[in-house]
């Protein structure tokens, strides 16, 4: 994706079936055939949406739905541990907990095919540990993210599921 911010990058990924759109065209209506997850649903994939945050800042969740065609319900975030607070004070959930919740849901599902969109932001500028105002050390946050991903990939491999994971980093991430 040729973009430098998470909202447009997510929309570009979700509209991948129509190729790389100009930034201006990204905010114009799109045909249903452009929506990657709709096309995957036609192939029998169950759609899922997960966020490691509440999706409210910058209307991120709203943009996923209106511009990216992502209509799946947001995975339940109730009871997820909060590892950080975002620059706007909203919760940033622990990635391993979010991902493990998804894996448990998948293991209980009767559909062996799923396509899941997950957006997380523990490396975003301005994130801080709960109860502190100083931005949390980037190295500490990066190590935690990589450890969480490594632990999750280990569990995913043990599950025996056939998977493809695509990681799209954001600037600074």
PLM region descriptions:
Residues 127-149:
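Active-site-proximal segments of metal-dependent phosphoesterases and phosphodiesterases across multiple
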């Amino acid at each position: 994706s040729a973009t430098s911010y998470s909202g447009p990058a997510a929309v570009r990924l979700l509209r991948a079936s129509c190729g790389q759109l100009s930034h201006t065209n990204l905010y114009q209506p799109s045909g249903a055939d452009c929506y990657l997850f709709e096309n995957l649903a036609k192939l029998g994939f169950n759609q899922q949406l997960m966020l490691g945050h509440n999706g409210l800042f910058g209307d991120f969740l709203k943009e996923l739905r209106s511009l990216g065609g992502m209509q799946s319900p947001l995975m339940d975030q109730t009871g997820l541990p909060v590892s950080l607070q975002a620059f706007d004070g909203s919760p940033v959930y622990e990635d391993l907990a979010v991902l493990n919740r998804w894996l448990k849901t998948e293991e209980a599902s009767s559909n062996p095919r799923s396509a899941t969109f997950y957006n997380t932001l523990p490396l975003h500028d301005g994130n801080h540990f709960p109860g502190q105002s100083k931005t949390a050390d980037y190295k500490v946050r990066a190590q935690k993210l990589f450890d969480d991903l490594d632990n999750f990939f280990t569990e995913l491999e043990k599950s025996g599921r056939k998977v493809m994971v695509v990681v799209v980093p954001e600037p600074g991430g």
